[in-house]
């Protein structure tokens, strides 16, 4: 799988992920891009799960963003509805972490839309490790969101064999607004 982490702090939301693609116990690729900017750079999205499945969901989510004029919550709910009712989509095994300047959501393979606690999302095989690290850093430091994401991904990569050190990190800075 992979590790995707999102942290919101002090006028920034950041999503980061590693680049490892595995097939069973074999690393197939180390530099996959699993974090993307959508809707003219106003929305961040990261995915964990089967790569082809995740790209399919990412494309569908981007279409929902367009259809709902960039309204993140409406797009997430619309995708989740499709996910639950479309037989082909129900077979896709992936998770999405999405965020804009106002809200963050996890969209699950069961068609659930979850708004996280503590302005923190961590999904994928290394998600629990990254979440633990991020919580500790959020509660005990004044580090910015990007640094917390970087450190959380590093810790997850040191523990999880399905997470590597090749990170893609995207930042939405809305502190000046």
Curated annotation (Swiss-Prot):
One Gene Ontology term, aspect cellular component: proteasome core complex
UniProt subcellular location: Cytoplasm
Keyword Hydrolase included in the entry's annotation: yes
Binding site for Na(+): 157, 160, 163
A GO term, aspect molecular function: threonine-type endopeptidase activity
EC number(s) given by UniProt: 3.4.25.2
Alphabetized UniProt keyword annotations: Allosteric enzyme, Cytoplasm, Hydrolase, Metal-binding, Protease, Sodium, Threonine protease
InterPro entries hit by this protein: ATP-dep_Prtase_HsIV_su, Ntn_hydrolases_N, Proteasome_sua/b, Proteasome_suB-type
Catalysed reactions listed for this entry: ATP-dependent cleavage of peptide bonds with broad specificity
Alphabetized Gene3D superfamilies for the sequence: Glutamine Phosphoribosylpyrophosphate, subunit 1, domain 1
Pfam family, one: Proteasome
Domain of life: Bacteria
UniProt activity-regulation remark: Allosterically activated by HslU binding.
One GO BP annotation of this record: proteolysis involved in protein catabolic process
Primary location group: cytoplasm
Residues the record marks as active site: 2
Family membership: Belongs to the peptidase T1B family. HslV subfamily.
Assembly: A double ring-shaped homohexamer of HslV is capped on each side by a ring-shaped HslU homohexamer. The assembly of the HslU/HslV complex is dependent on binding of ATP.
Function per UniProt: Protease subunit of a proteasome-like degradation complex believed to be a general protein degrading machinery.
Name of this protein: ATP-dependent protease subunit HslV
Organism: Aeromonas salmonicida (strain A449)
Gene name tied to this protein: hslV
